[in-house]
Amino acid sequence: HLILQGKGGVGKSMIAALIAQYQLTKGKRPLCLDTDPVNASFQAYKGLPVTRLNILQDEEIDPRSFDQLVELISHAKGDVVIDNGASSFVPLSAYLITNQVSAVLQDMGHQIMVHTVITGGQAQSDTLHGFTQLVKQFPSDVSFVVWLNPYWGPIERDGKPFEQMKAYTVHKDRISAMIRLPDLKKETFGRDLSDM
């Protein structure tokens, strides 16, 4: 479970935490990795067994450090949940695509599932563009889980929901699941979620 989106602050770490928590409730012990070199948000969730993977070398992202990531995945017996920060989005995506990591991992018995976020509000265009670019760049055997996060506003354009937007209609065959995060009242549960 690879959480990828080039836009920061859209809920990637929260989604990684939700996936990890779900796995734990099913009695599984996922390998949880935080590759964000700036904010270790996933690792900050207490109670989750998250390991932070240092991908910086002399304050620059070292693409070769992703070899260690693939090595960890290759030895994993169960699910792997990887939170990737906006600052390392481009280098990690380039590494995965250039080195055909999905094919390598599939040969080892693993399946890559890319989770991405579409958000409402000001970042909506950026997240839609990010999703479209991911789908175009990753091989066709990689499927996507799209998380719709209304925290910053409704996910609609010109009165149309995501399912009627071009980003969805053109690429719907690559989407294996769509998860709608609830639009919680800001005064109650929304505040709790935001504090997390």
What are these regions (language model features)?
Residues 2-4, 81, 114-118:
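Short glycine-rich or small-residue beta-strand-to-loop segments that form or flank ligand, phosphate
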Residues 2, 16, 25-89, 95:
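Nucleotide-state-sensitive switch-loop elements of NTP-binding domains
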Residues 196:
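C-terminal boundary of histidine-terminating zinc-finger modules
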Residues 12:
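Conserved lysine of the Walker
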Residues 88-183, 187-191:
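Conserved catalytic-core segment of NTP-binding enzymes
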Residues 8-9:
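Walker A (P-loop) phosphate-binding loop of P-loop NTPases
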Residues 5, 17, 106-109:
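Amphipathic, alpha-helical segments enriched in basic
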